[in-house]
Amino acid sequence: MSLENLSCQKSFGGWHKRYKHHSDVLGCDMTFAVYLPPQAEQGGKLPVLYWLSGLTCTDENFMQKAGAQRMAAELGLIIVAPDTSPRGLGVPGDPDNAWDFGLGAGFYLNATQEPWAKHYRMHDYVVQELPALVEAHFPASDKRGISGHSMGGHGALVCALRNPGRYLSVSAFSPINNPMDCPWGQKAFSRYLGEERSKWREWDACVLISEASEQLPLLVDQGDRDDFLAVQLKPEALQQAAKAAGHRLEL
């Protein structure tokens, strides 16, 4: 699969690059950003952190604003940031042009309902297609970590819990912990997955943690003055689920 380089900037001795490619999984062209630390030019394979951004974001937000490249350069760590949804001609968005569903709000799941099912398969893209592409074109090893913020934090937790052995670490900043029980999640799940709540359980970290076959420790960072804390994020739900399952969680 070919890559088209869209931009390239020197950063902390390495390179911050942006690429476009066609995704067979999503049925559209996608962009992603990658940081290649200085060690990428020295030979050998490097570990990769996949970063999943939140609602309304693109592949550029974290890579342009977070400043994580400095630490990645020190650690010899590749960072890969995909977009937050499929985009482009023929990809449906929210019929009301809302910001919390559709374009920029793919929720890192595999939609089953029309018209979303054809394109909104962000889970398979993030877990399977994108890493295969990255490992084919860059000096990236199969030592993977995954992290994210808000909707992306939800995505990181779900990707790790659903795919034992796929990641060596998982962490999240202010994640949507219990999407089945918050307005953002309920809106997205009802449209992407339908009204049958039993199908929602497959994409909720609080449910998945009780069924996890791998005890991969979870690291969650949450500010106690977050405006969305009580209604949307619900870290206490994840804490209770982890305690009940005996799953290690640092919150």
Go through the PLM ranges and name each one.
Residues M1-L251:
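Non-catalytic cap/lid and distal C-terminal segments of serine-dependent acyl enzymes
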